[in-house]
């Protein structure tokens, strides 16, 4: 480790010990060096004994800074790693940090765009509207048309900090399999790698701009979700310019109720937006926490959402979508055999998995869920239970499914916060069944034909020539095969002749040797000579084949 990494590691250890997180060290023989190290650092007491372990972990991550805050947020979705009480506390982590100087933000924007700010913008506000660990936002107006906008700027020098902490996380991840009995199954390096990819993606605002443009296109003229316009002419890797929007934070229940918002419709539309993104578009906003979702002031009786911050998105391929939809329907029909078979068929678990054992494990974990009324069953926790059970059967980490699970938990939590009686299954089931129906049977065949018609119409004039070329190739192939077959037959004949000559030569040589041993004078040498000539001739023929 470098001196800088050692200093950072000591700071992390000191913060963890001051929150009593040495309790997380398992009391097994392999961890005695860590427990002994705790005794050596006796001057760092636990100053938060009155708080629960989960709360202490959350506070420690907040003290370590933005990189660790985001890491904790990601870990909150991996409930196979922690007990529910700890995972719930990690989900409360807030990514809020002090803003950096507005003059520095102006300088960064001007450097990125290659000119004075006033060339493109008016009324630039140097005080940040919002600030997070990766970037902060300033308000302004477009000079060309007076449109209100926000300018998002990546924090200066954030990349070296992220890379340094990620390197340290990888080193710590290498220790986990050695210190925890179940450490290898948890795949700590994959967890860190997934987090690293998420962070690096968030640092590229051109990627976020492209994501927002795609989502805006998907929900053009939608009555459920509004995506602000992106002004791509002014976007760079570290600067993003988008339309400024106004709305009520979705978590501000009092404000929503004060304007008589239709809460039931709003909650149901949140579910519809999520499933539309996942199954219709295969492209979903994967960071739908309350800070990124607003509700329009307009038409409270017919409310719609406004989404921001598209740095993290997810996508599912066609097979994943089908297996996921069938999994949900099979689960709510309590067909655990079908759930187990779908996991194997999809490749989510190894093909040699014992389906009977897997079915029993799913039944054991999931059957108690149905003791509750259907309206109280958590979709997100259903998915979570399924994945946690599957991981015991060596289910590989599926980043797209982890993102989906996290997003579903957000959507469901928001929906029930808005309207506690929300029956998510009742809202989602018609959508899933309709989508599955569209993927199989006559509608799917007709759609596939429609998609292929332009291609075949383009290729139709070429069809006679293609058929002729194919027949000619077939004819030439037949001639080549016949020539090759004849050549192979000739080679086989030569090989048999050579083997025969080798055998004859060896026999004559052996006979001559025996005659020589019996005391005969000239005859043995005749046999030996003939055998040697025959053997050499056969060998030469064999070498030429």
Swiss-Prot record:
GO biological process: regulation of ubiquinone biosynthetic process; ubiquinone biosynthetic process
Keywords carried by this UniProt record: ATP-binding, Cell inner membrane, Cell membrane, Kinase, Membrane, Nucleotide-binding, Transferase, Transmembrane, Transmembrane helix, Ubiquinone biosynthesis
Group of enzyme by EC: transferase
Domain Protein kinase span(s) in chain numbering: 123-501
Pathway: Cofactor biosynthesis; ubiquinone biosynthesis [regulation]
CDD domains assigned to the protein according to its UniProt record, in alphabetical order: UbiB (cd13972)
GO MF assignments: ATP binding; protein kinase activity
List of catalytic residues: 287 (proton acceptor)
Subcellular location: Cell inner membrane
Gene Ontology CC annotations of this record: plasma membrane
EC number: 2.7.-.-
A Pfam short name: ABC1
Family: Belongs to the ABC1 family. UbiB subfamily.
Name of this protein: Probable protein kinase UbiB
Provenance organism: Photorhabdus laumondii subsp. laumondii (strain DSM 15139 / CIP 105565 / TT01) (Photorhabdus luminescens subsp. laumondii)
Gene name of the record: ubiB
């Amino acid at each position: 480790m470098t001196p800088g990494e050692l200093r950072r590691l000591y700071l992390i250890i000191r913060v963890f010990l001051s929150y009593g997180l040495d309790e997380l060290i398992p009391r097994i023989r392999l961890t005695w060096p860590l427990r002994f190290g705790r005794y050596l650092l006796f001057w760092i007491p636990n100053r938060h004994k009155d708080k629960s372990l989960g709360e202490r972990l959350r506070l420690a991550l907040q003290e370590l800074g933005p990189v660790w805050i985001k890491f904790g947020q990601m870990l909150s979705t991996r409930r196979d790693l922690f007990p529910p009480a700890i995972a719930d506390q990690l989900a409360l982590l807030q990514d809020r940090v002090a803003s950096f100087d507005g003059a520095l933000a102006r300088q960064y924007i001007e450097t990125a765009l290659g000119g004075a700010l006033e060339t493109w913008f008016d009324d630039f506000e140097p005080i940040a509207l919002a600030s997070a660990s990766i970037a902060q936002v300033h308000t302004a107006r477009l000079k060309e048309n007076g449109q209100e906008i926000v300018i998002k700027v990546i924090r200066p020098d954030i990349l070296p900090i992220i890379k340094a902490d990620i390197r340290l996380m990888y080193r710590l991840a290498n220790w986990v399999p050695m210190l925890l009995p179940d450490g290898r199954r948890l795949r700590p390096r994959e967890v860190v790698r997934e987090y690293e990819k998420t962070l690096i993606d968030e640092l590229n605002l051109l990627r976020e701009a492209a994501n927002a443009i795609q989502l805006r296109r998907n929900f053009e003229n939608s009555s459920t979700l509004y995506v602000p316009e992106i002004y791509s002419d002014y976007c760079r890797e570290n600067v993003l310019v988008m339309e400024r929007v106004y709305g009520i934070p979705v978590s501000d229940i009092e404000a929503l109720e004060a304007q008589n918002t239709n809460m039931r419709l709003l909650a149901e539309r949140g579910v519809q937006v999520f499933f539309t993104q996942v199954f219709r578009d295969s492209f979903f906003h994967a960071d739908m926490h309350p800070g990124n979702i607003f509700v329009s002031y307009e038409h409270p009786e017919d409310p719609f959402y406004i989404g921001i911050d598209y740095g993290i998105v997810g996508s599912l391929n066609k097979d994943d979508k089908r297996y996921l939809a069938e999994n949900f329907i099979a689960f709510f029909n309590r067909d655990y055999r079908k759930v187990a078979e779908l996991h194997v068929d999809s490749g989510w678990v190894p093909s040699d998995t014992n389906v009977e054992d897997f079915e029993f494990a799913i039944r054991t974990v999931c059957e108690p869920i149905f003791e509750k009324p259907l309206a109280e069953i958590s979709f997100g926790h259903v998915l979570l239970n399924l994945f946690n059970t599957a991981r015991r059967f060596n289910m590989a980490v599926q980043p797209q499914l982890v993102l989906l699970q996290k997003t579903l938990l957000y959507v469901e939590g928001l929906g029930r916060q808005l309207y506690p009686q929300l029956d998510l299954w009742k809202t989602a089931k018609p959508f899933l069944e309709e989508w599955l129906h569209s993927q199989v049977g006559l509608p799917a065949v007709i759609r596939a034909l429609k998609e292929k018609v332009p291609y075949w119409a383009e290729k139709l004039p070429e069809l006679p020539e293609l058929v002729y070329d194919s027949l000619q190739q077939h004819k030439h192939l037949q001639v080549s095969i016949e020539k090759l077959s004849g050549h192979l037959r000739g080679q086989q004949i030569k090989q048999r002749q050579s083997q025969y000559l080798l055998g004859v030569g060896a026999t004559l040589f052996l006979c001559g040797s025996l005659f020589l041993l019996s005391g005969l004078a000239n005859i043995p040498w005749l046999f030996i000579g003939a055998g040697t000539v025959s053997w050499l001739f056969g060998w030469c023929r064999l070498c030429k084949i």
